[in-house]
Every structure is written in C-alpha cells, then in structure tokens.
C-alpha cells in the first residue's frame, strides 16, 4: 500500500462559478480545507507526501499553481479538456499503483470514508471502488492506475471518457472488478449534496460550515446531522 496517490482534480475555469476552488470558506480556501482533510486519512504518507493537485495548463490556472506552491502542495499541469490525459501524465511521473481521485469543489471529503473505501479496495482486490448512498461530495473514487493508462490508449476514445476520468469504467462494469460499497449508516444520506457547483451551493455550504463552527476537521456525519435538523436546506438534491 506504499504506492497510493491522492489526486485532486482542480481548475479555476468553472463556467458556473469561476475560481471556486480558491474561494474562502471561513478563514481558509476550499482547496486548502480539502487538502487538510485528505491528509487525515490513514493512507496519507507525510514522508512521501502522496497527494498532488492536477490542474490545467491554461493561463487561467497560473494563479492556482502559484497558490499550491505557496502552500507547499505538489502540483502537476496538463490538458484542460482531456482530463484523463492529465491524470495519466501524473501517473507516469509518480508511478503509483492505485489512485484516489478527488475534485477540488468537494471540501468536505471525509477521511474516515476514504479509509473505508481504500481498505475495501485492497481487501477485495478491486479495480475500481466507490461508495453509494452518501451525500454527493464526501467520498472520491479508488481506481488502479494501470486501468487509466489502458483506457487512455483505446483507439478513438470518445470525448466524454477523456473529460470524465472514470466514466469508461462505470459504463463498462463487466470488463472490470468494480466494487460499490454501501455507505456506513451515519453517512447514509443520499438526499444531500455537499459539493459546490453554483453560487447557491457555495452560499449554502458557507452557511452550513458556519453552523459547524468553521472547523476544517468537522466530520461529514456531523454535517449530515446539521442538515437533518433543517430538512429544507438548499443543499438537498433536487428530485430527478
């Protein structure tokens, strides 16, 4: 398990909420809170610093790279649209066997859930592992690095599979050892979203974070409890 790599996919160029990954949340930035939380995982290795930020090579992300360097985060840059290629570039440079894919607009990824998911991935010898029925934005995905390299080499790979890194695996589960875990009971609240896509999401998350005392270490289960006390919260998922 020494060659695990956490990869946080982040960029400044969101169409609905530009610059969201560096927006303030309490006294910190969204990205900084996420990095802090991931570093609480039992699988984070401080001596190796097995966490990187993968951003684009667009000029608009120069400010993000500068922020990462200032904060001491390892940062890699690659294609903005061909995100799979960006990940492969990181994999070829660092050479992990397993990656944990995270996105910079999910500041409340829970380290306990990360540990459950990663351990299950190894225990079951899976190719891909994901947690079901948790709030959107608190998990991430575990995937064997060689799979992403293999997928990137598929002839005439559709654009959607370049943009969405693990979508090919999810759309072709018969080809891989895919594991979908049920969220532990205290995290089981699929009706909520703890991700930031829009200005409304951001304002809702800010309000929730304030209620939680603006603590970077707050458990996702505690946030769920706060949301349960306010069933009309704007962070509820819209019905399909």
From Swiss-Prot:
Belongs to the CMP-NeuNAc synthase family. InterPro entries: Cytidylyl_trans, Nucleotide-diphossugar_trans. GO terms for cellular component: cytosol. Pathway: Spore coat biogenesis; spore coat polysaccharide biosynthesis. It comes from Bacillus subtilis (strain 168). This is Spore coat polysaccharide biosynthesis protein SpsF.
């Amino acid at each position: 398990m020494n060659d695990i790599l956490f990869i946080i996919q982040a960029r400044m160029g969101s169409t609905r909420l530009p610059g969201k990954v560096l927006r303030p949340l309490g006294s910190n930035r969204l990205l900084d809170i996420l990095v802090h939380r991931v570093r609480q995982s039992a699988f984070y290795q401080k001596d190796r610093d097995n966490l990187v930020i993968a951003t684009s090579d667009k000029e608009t992300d120069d400010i993000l790279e500068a922020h990462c360097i200032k904060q001491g985060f390892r940062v890699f840059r690659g294609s903005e649209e061909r995100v799979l290629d960006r990940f492969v570039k990181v994999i070829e440079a660092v050479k992990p066997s397993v990656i944990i894919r995270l996105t910079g607009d999910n500041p409340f990824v829970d380290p306990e859930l990360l540990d459950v998911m990663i351990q299950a991935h190894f225990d079951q010898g899976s190719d891909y592992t994901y947690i079901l029925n948790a709030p959107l934005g608190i998990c991430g995905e575990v995937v064997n690095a060689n799979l992403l390299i293999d997928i990137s080499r598929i002839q005439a790979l559709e654009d959607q599979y370049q943009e969405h890194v693990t979508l090919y695996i999810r759309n072709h589960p018969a080809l891989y050892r895919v594991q979908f875990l049920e969220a532990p009971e205290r995290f089981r609240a699929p009706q909520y979203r703890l991700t930031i896509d829009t200005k409304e999401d951001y304002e809702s998350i800010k309000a929730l974070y304030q209620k939680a005392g603006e603590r970077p270490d707050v458990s996702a289960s505690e946030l769920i409890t706060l949301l349960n006390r306010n069933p009309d919260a704007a962070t509820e998922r819209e019905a399909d």
